[in-house]
Amino acid sequence: MAVSPQVRAGAPAVPERPRARKARTGGRAGYGFVSGYFVLLLLFGIGPTVYAIWLAISNSSGQLVGFGNFTQVLGDYRFFPAFANVALYLVIWLVVLVVAVVGIALMLHGRMRRASAVSRFFFYLPGALAGAASALVWMFMLDPSVSPVAWLLHGLGYGTFSDTIAPSRLPVVFAIMAFWTGAGGWIVVMYGALNNIPGELLEAARIDGASVLKTAWYVQIPLLRKWIAYMLILAFATGTQLFVEPQLVGEASLGQVSDTWSPNQLAYEYAFHANNFNDASAVSIYLLVLGLAAAALVVFKSGLFEVGS
């Protein structure tokens, strides 16, 4: 009977198996891809944030002043109106976004399955006109003298561009602009999330006699909870950074709209008109804290990072 030989001391090592070597190489490649994200995050996220914090707690000479800059901007008569304007805009924008995006996604999923591919493509198109381009298009649309929907504007009692962009109407106007450019992508995301809901759940609801509305309210929407929370966090962060739209509309209004309508405009005013980057950084830190607080609230209330729910 043959006996397997014993491994002698000093014997040559057994060559590493190709599969193990390939797995190790694949792991290193994964770290390489992820490292690019962290480098960009450090350069354009964490680094600027740390620098802004330093500017916010120091003066132009580099001396620490603690919360002096925060107190100074808080006492500016333009501070609270700017934040109030954006707060009203966010309420309108987020409510319309959630209701319309979820509603349209449910409609696509339930009633327009055959046409959904074409519809999703068209939902993406408005996003091609973002920022300044979108604002310019909407300024053209909102001017009754040249707008293709002038009949609608006249019917609403808006005879001139100044009537359309009256300060009291700006939160609604900016919410419409934001929905036009940003909702399409979220509709497609929600539609994809609906497709991941097991068909057995929907079939069980139908067997139990649930109507389409009850199925949506008690089955589909609860399963979209985390996606809705994720959308709210990103939309809130984007909304607090509102700048391009009020800036362009303000320039076109010939002084009718304030140059500091939004907090970002106020920070811009501090930095580039008053040459006060310290107060501008303080405003940006206020926005950062507000965004982080809102994100934390949504995460904890929705269980966004809970596993298995």
Residues covered by each model-derived region:
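A structural signal for multi-pass alpha-helical bundles of membrane permease subunits
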Residues: 26-309
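Short, Lys/Arg-rich, polar N-terminal cytosolic tail immediately upstream
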Residues: 1-25
